[in-house]
Amino acid sequence: AEELPGIKNIVIHKIPKTHDNVIFLDKNDQKININEYTGNLLILNFWATWCEPCKEEMPSLDKLQANPELDKIKIFPINIGKETSNKVNKFFIDLNIKNFEPYFDPPTTLAKMFSLRGVPTTILINKKGQEFARVIGSIDFEDKNFINWIKKYN
């Protein structure tokens, strides 16, 4: 895996990885399957309310969803802290998050599937539904280098 010039924490896979049955829940406990979003650039951000770096990066991730240059992007912030929806909603309100809603993985199946070592970890999935890169730890998602790079996948 190669490091992206100018941005720490990004790991790019030489060969994109396929993950089957990437399923998680929305706030109404409805199942979301990423296969339904083939053709979109997907960002799965794994986080928890007690995670300070998650709190720092979430507003920039929220702005990324609203970026007009990235019309094919769909961001799923997936809580893997086994936290209540009240706690999660308060976290989003406190941070003034406007452009996406929280999602949940209560059994933390995805943490195992993606071999997550900690939060935040962000998985980047191309339009074919394959993981092509990941961010280990937090970054500023409004960083120009990041946006110029991610635009190529939009």
Regions found by a protein language model. Give the residues of each.
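A short beta-strand-turn-helix
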Residues: 21-42
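Thiol/disulfide oxidoreductase modules built on the thioredoxin-like
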Residues: 90-99, 105-151
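Structural microenvironment flanking redox-active thiols in thiol-disulfide oxidoreductases
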Residues: 56-95, 106-113
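Loop/turn elements at helix/coil->beta-strand transitions in domains of secreted/extracellular proteins
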Residues: 39-41, 71-74, 99-100
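Soluble periplasmic/extracytoplasmic beta-strand elements of cell-envelope proteins
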Residues: 45, 77-79, 134-136
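N-terminal targeting signals for export/organelle localization
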Residues: 1-21
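Conserved redox-active cysteine motifs that mediate thiol-disulfide chemistry
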Residues: 38, 46-63
